[in-house]
């Protein structure tokens, strides 16, 4: 069987007492048109006339709940969706084209661009507005999903605002370089790392046979076109060009997106944005040292859901 190559760029890739309340909201499958087949998601309906949040997952094989096929199961987006329902806010969380429930939307889940992901977001917005009658839709993105949210919002009047969770402020080539440089065992191959990323940033492909075996999966030929496209986008510039309400959440102990290197760039790009820094939260927005729930999920910081809900309700 032909092996699947998943994009994996981020290398280090609490809601308490909500379950009983979340049951009051109706959860059902929902689809949107994709290029070759449907895009799939889950609609949590908190009631007629409620605000709706569209949730875009992060990089690689990350599903609509925020769980990774590579083993990490924080369920960040599912927890947020269930939590928002208790505040009377509906949501749609989605699988990306070519993956999970949206596998049939395209022939190859690695043959994608940020612009195509953004196009899918706009397709979802049309479906959700038609289904709910909402005038506009909030778009929430986690990690790379925040970049997709920013790209989708350019010139779109039917987006209420953006909610950016653990979102890079630097181009992702710079983020990946920093992540790899932070790995102690990578010290001897740093020149190869820098050469490969420099080439991709310049729009050039990399011969993986010239790389250390441990780097060949990161720069696999099947993901290089996506990486070339991805590295071309500057989140801070996209945010600067967007003029709607923006809510930014960043974990202080996030090892993938930096509270010191990324967050200041986003704040500078939009001084009017509402920013919440959670000092002890990791990339998934769980507290550092959080004890996994029985389903393996990591309870997110208790401030995340009420802060998002308050921001939406104020706008």
Where are these regions (language model features)?
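Short alpha-helix in the alpha/beta-hydrolase fold that links the catalytic acid
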Residues: 244, 257-268
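Catalytic active-site module of serine/aspartate enzymes centered on a nucleophile-bearing elbow/loop
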Residues: 281-285, 289-315
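Conserved alpha/beta-hydrolase
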Residues: 76-103
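Short, surface-exposed "cap/lid" segments of acyl-processing enzymes
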Residues: 48, 53-84
């Amino acid at each position: 069987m032909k092996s699947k190559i998943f994009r994996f760029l981020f290398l280090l890739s609490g809601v308490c007492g909500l379950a009983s309340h979340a049951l009051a909201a109706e959860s059902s499958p929902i689809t949107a048109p994709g290029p070759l087949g449907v895009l799939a998601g889950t609609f949590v309906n908190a009631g007629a006339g409620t605000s709706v949040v569209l949730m875009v997952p992060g990089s690689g094989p990350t599903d609509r709940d925020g769980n990774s096929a590579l083993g990490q199961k924080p369920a960040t987006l599912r927890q947020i969706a269930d939590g928002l329902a208790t505040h009377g806010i509906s949501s749609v969380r989605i699988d990306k084209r070519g993956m999970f429930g949206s596998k049939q939307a395209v022939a190859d889940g690695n043959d994608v661009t940020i612009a195509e992901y953004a196009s899918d977001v706009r397709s979802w917005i049309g479906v959700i507005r038609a289904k709910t009658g909402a005038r506009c839709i909030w778009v929430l993105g986690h990690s790379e999903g925040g970049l997709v949210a920013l790209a989708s919002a350019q010139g779109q009047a039917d987006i209420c605002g953006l909610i950016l969770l653990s979102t890079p402020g630097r181009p992702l080539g710079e983020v990946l370089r920093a992540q790899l440089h932070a790995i102690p065992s990578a010290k001897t191959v740093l020149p190869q790392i820098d050469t490969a990323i420099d080439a991709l940033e310049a729009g050039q492909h990399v011969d993986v046979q010239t790389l250390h075996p441990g780097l060949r999966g990161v720069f696999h030929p099947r993901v290089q076109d996506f990486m070339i496209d991805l590295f071309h986008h500057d989140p801070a510039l996209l945010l600067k060009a967007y003029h709607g309400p923006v809510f930014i959440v960043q974990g202080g102990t996030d090892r993938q997106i930096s509270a010191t290197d990324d967050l200041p760039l986003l704040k500078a790009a939009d001084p009017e944005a509402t920013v919440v820094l959670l000092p002890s939260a990791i990339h998934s927005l769980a507290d550092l040292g959080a004890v996994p729930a029985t389903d393996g999920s990591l309870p997110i910081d208790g401030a995340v859901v009420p802060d998002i809900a308050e921001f939406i309700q104020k706008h």
